[in-house]
Amino acid sequence: MNAVPVEADRVSEIVIVGGGTAGWMTAAALSKVLSRSYSIRLVESEEIGTVGVGEATIPMIKLFNSALDLDENQFVRETMGSFKLGIEFVNWGQLGDSYIHGFGKIGQDLGLVPFYQYWLKMHQAGKAAPLDDYSINTHAARHNRFMRAVTDRPNSPLAAIGYD
């Protein structure tokens, strides 16, 4: 049996069924990474409209857009997007509680020991503030502040700002 596919068996056409964000992002990614010898077609229903709930992403969208050579400023402007520093969970744990899961780094490692190890030990002793208090993104979100990460100073806490 021949394990090498013959030219007639080679896939040359790709059909993506379903539009929306997932369909169009898939089509964009495949068209970027596959050679021009592939035909990519997206099929979406005219009967199914836009959901209209707003789109939300996580920080990995920056890597995705970068892989597609999309300029972040232009992307945000043309999509009328905004920046998100984290996700807030209202009534988290019990009514009245809220928790912001800030994107980016939480706390600062001390030597070879990760921050969360110190926090956990202090938390077990009843001496730690809530974990999100150690997130620069959470503080910024609570005070309606935003800036991009300072990438030229890797040891600065401002280098750890994560956003979407």
Predicted regions mapped to residue ranges:
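A short, Lys/Arg-enriched amphipathic alpha-helix followed by its capping loop at the start of a domain
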Residues: 14, 26-38, 64
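Beta1/beta-strand and adjacent pyrophosphate-binding region of the FAD-binding site
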Residues: 8-22, 41
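Dinucleotide-binding Rossmann-like beta1-alpha1 core, especially the glycine-rich loop
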Residues: 53-143
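Basic/polar N-terminal segments that are highly enriched at the extreme N-terminus
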Residues: 1-9
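A short N-terminal beta->alpha junction/helix N-cap motif
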Residues: 15-18, 48-56
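Glycine-rich FAD pyrophosphate-binding loop
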Residues: 31-53
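Short beta-strand to alpha-helix junction loop
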Residues: 155-164
